[in-house]
A protein has these predicted regions:
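N-terminal cofactor/phosphate-binding cores enriched in small/glycine residues
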Residues: 57-152, 168-187, 191, 195
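Blade/loop signatures of beta-propeller domains
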Residues: 39-79, 257-264, 432-456, 558
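Extracytoplasmic beta-rich repeat domains
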Residues: 80-100, 130-159, 191-214, 256-286, ...
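Bacterial N-terminal signal peptides
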Residues: 23-34
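A structural motif specific to WD40 beta-propellers
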Residues: 77, 126-130, 186, 252-253, ...
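Beta-propeller blade signature
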Residues: 178, 238-250, 315-329, 383, ...
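Phosphate/diphosphate-binding loops
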Residues: 351-399
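Repeat-blade elements of multi-bladed beta-propeller folds
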Residues: 48-52, 93-116, 141-174, 207-233, ...
Length: 673
């Protein structure tokens, strides 16, 4: 997991060249479009009952009480404080409040970074209950975040407690089942309301195998992935996807993206001995559920470690892939690998988005996957064929002994959301002549051949950097207009391979204040990584460093892009804040009111943009960093619409720490309809 922190369609032969659509696909797609299936709604028919708004992950709300015409009057309605500020927590420097609440059964449910689950009144923000699973706060965890919870209700009337349940994962790798009404553990689930997710797995470091995203729910199944601490070693924990019975907690199926035997569907593409001594390939982001086709869509990350692959040669099939699994059995239905032999930490972090995409005038059930490379891919949902051409293109080779970078990578024909070319010395930017001079020297010294340049001992410039592109914040989908909206990072990063001796020297020095280090034990090289910054700590490339981008899928074009975030709080006192566009963590949501709401940027504002033009219409300063994805719902006798965001800051990004959940609404008289 990253720490930092239709004109013409074509398919692609895995590992091969671009080709035309397979015979008969148009007829098959026409049939699929003509017979849409109705998806089950969230228990309680709530407006935002899933982390991604709905099971499809569209992050789109049909609410329009707040709209272009009145959003300027939006104001805080209530604020709740969780009390989680890191006291007594050994990993307090990593605390990141990324929670998106869900609305179900008349309550808002959310989870703090230390896995305290809380139920709130949606109108007032008053606490209804809270449950603390008491994770070991003295343990050092690889991550310290939790993005949300999932809800479930028995399909048949049942007596007693826990008919309606909240499921949540924890930093110490437990799956919790809580009574949605009281917050008490469901005694009939696992052992006293929890399942130990480490059972049956190879655990090298208990603090580095975690759950940071809400599980997927399909019928009576709860499906969970894992986050695994990056770059410790080659032989780390494996990213097994598992399903449990929502009532009893009994294990029902497991799917390991990495082959463990010759019968595994990816075995032919791996050296099995290497596969067995490799880890990760995990799904740490949010999965999506396709009830119509009975699928769970699973985005996976890199095999371990991220920046040296000499001991995991080949494409590393099923790592860095979009997997479509049969939700009932865990059987692989189809897969598309979007990064071959990852050497850049380009995990598939964004939630897959399910919806209809227009193809030759017909709506086709599709899955849209945004990536940290800044590329968007669109596949037909039931069989996984590309709906926009995907082409294998040659990319730079490795100069490192023992490394075999894959010679091609799959490029989408949709316009990229982030630049892919090399950063040139003449691109150097800075506030002073000295800044620009030092940045030119830095750029000239690095290996730098554009996207997919392999890591090197001289240092490699990554464009996009290892935070994206599009990270876990994902995308919002306005299906009626065929628009995908994403918060995008554009800041280049530097990765350097180090000998073990050089690693020990550098990690003990004070010369790398902006750097992260990883030992990558079991390989010849450790790694160091950092943003491309001048000696003053300013970016070496011109702004924007973060944007909000809208892609028009009907016309295969960028509809608009706007800088996301200002330099407020990050510039000397004598310089004015500028709307340059800043690095961001968190995602957008879209509404039928013609608005896109997004926090994410480092300056701590929640913003509203016009969904048609990208113009900023409103912003409000949050009490702490808003590195989370907002949500919206209606509640109360007047069905007042609220927009809610968690504001607690992001440890690795260094934004203001806090413990706030803030709701915004129109003044009551204006909210009435």
């Amino acid at each position: 997991m990253t720490g930092y922190a239709l004109k013409s369609r074509a398919g692609v032969v895995p590992g091969g060249r671009c080709r035309g659509r397979a015979p008969g696909i148009v007829a098959a797609l026409s049939l699929a479009a003509a017979t849409p299936g109705a998806l089950p709604q969230t228990p309680g028919s709530s407006d935002w009952g899933y982390y991604g708004g709905d099971a499809l992950g569209q992050r789109f709300s049909s609410l329009d009480q707040i709209n272009r015409g009145n959003v300027a009057r939006l104001a805080p309605a209530w604020t709740y404080r969780t009390g989680e500020l890191g006291a007594g927590f050994a990993s307090a420097g990593k605390l990141t409040f990324e929670a998106t609440p869900v609305l179900a059964f008349g309550r808002l449910y959310l989870e703090t970074a230390t896995n305290v689950v809380i139920a709130l009144d949606p109108e007032s923000g008053r606490e209804r209950w809270r449950f603390d699973p008491h994770i070991d706060r003295a343990r050092r965890y690889a991550q310290a975040s939790a993005r949300g919870v999932s809800v479930w209700a028995a399909s048949e009337p049942a007596d007693g407690v826990c008919r309606r349940r909240i499921f949540a994962g924890t930093l110490d790798a437990r799956l919790l089942a809580l009574d949605a009404d009281t917050g008490r553990p469901c005694s009939d689930f696992g052992a006293g309301g929890e399942v130990d997710l480490t059972r049956g797995l190879r655990i090298r470091d208990a603090g580095a195998f975690l759950v940071t995203s809400p599980p997927a729910v399909f019928g009576k199944l709860v499906i969970v992935g894992s986050a695994i601490g990056d770059n410790r070693a080659a032989d780390v924990e494996r990213g097994v996807i598992r399903a449990y019975d929502a009532q009893s907690g009994a294990p029902l199926w497991a799917f390991d993206p990495l082959p463990d035997s010759a019968s595994h569907p990816a075995a032919a593409d791996w050296n099995l001995a290497q596969a067995q001594s490799t880890g990760a390939g995990n799904s740490w982001g949010v999965m999506s559920v396709d009830h119509e086709h009975g699928l769970v869509l699973v985005p996976t990350g890199s095999a371990s470690p991220d920046y040296y692959g000499g001991q995991r040669l080949g494409t590393n099939r099923f790592a860095n892939s979009l997997l479509a699994l049969d939700a009932r059995s865990g059987r692989l239905v189809w897969q598309q690998q979007l990064i071959h032999h990852d050497l850049w930490d380009y995990d598939l972090a964004a939630q897959p988005v399910l919806g209809d995409v227009e193809v030759e005038g017909l709506p086709v059930p599709a899955v849209i996957q945004a990536t940290q490379t800044g590329m968007l891919y669109v596949f037909e949902r039931s069989r996984g064929q590309p709906l926009f051409p995907v082409m294998e293109r040659r990319v730079p080779s490795s100069h490192i002994a023992g490394e075999q970078a894959w010679p091609t990578q799959p490029f989408s024909s949709l316009p990229p959301l982030a630049p892919q070319r090399a950063v040139l010395a003449e691109d150097a930017w800075g506030l002073t002549v000295w800044d620009r001079y030092e940045c030119r020297k830095l750029i000239a010294a690095l290996r730098n051949e554009g996207i997919f340049t392999p890591p090197d001992t001289r240092g490699t410039l990554l464009t996009p950097g290892y935070i994206g592109g599009v990270n876990w914040g994902g995308t919002a989908f306005d299906q009626d207009h065929g628009r995908i909206i994403a918060a995008v990072n554009l800041l280049p990063m530097v990765v350097t391979l180090l000998t073990p001796a050089e690693y020990e020297r550098q990690v003990r020095s004070a010369d790398y204040p902006h750097s992260q280090f990883g030992r990558q034990a079991g390989t010849p090289y450790a790694m160091r990584r950092e943003p491309l910054l001048s000696p003053w700590g300013l970016p070496c490339t011109a702004p924007p460093w973060g944007t909000l981008v809208s892609v028009d899928l009907r016309h295969n074009r960028i509809a608009w892009q706007s800088p996301l975030g200002s330099t407020e709080g990050f510039t000397p006192w004598f310089l004015p804040a500028r709307e340059f566009g800043m690095p961001n963590m968190g995602g957008p949501i879209a509404t039928a009111g013609g608005l896109v709401f997004v926090g994410a940027a480092m300056d701590g504002y929640l913003r509203a943009f016009d969904i048609e033009t990208g113009a900023e219409l409103w912003k409000h300063k949050l009490p702490a960093g808003g590195q989370a994805t907002p949500m919206t719902y209606r509640a109360g006798a007047t069905q007042r619409q609220y927009v809610v965001i968690s504001a607690g800051g992001h440890g690795p990004l260094g934004t203001t720490r806090g413990d706030y959940v803030t709701a915004f609404a129109l003044p009551p008289a204006r909210a009435a309809r």
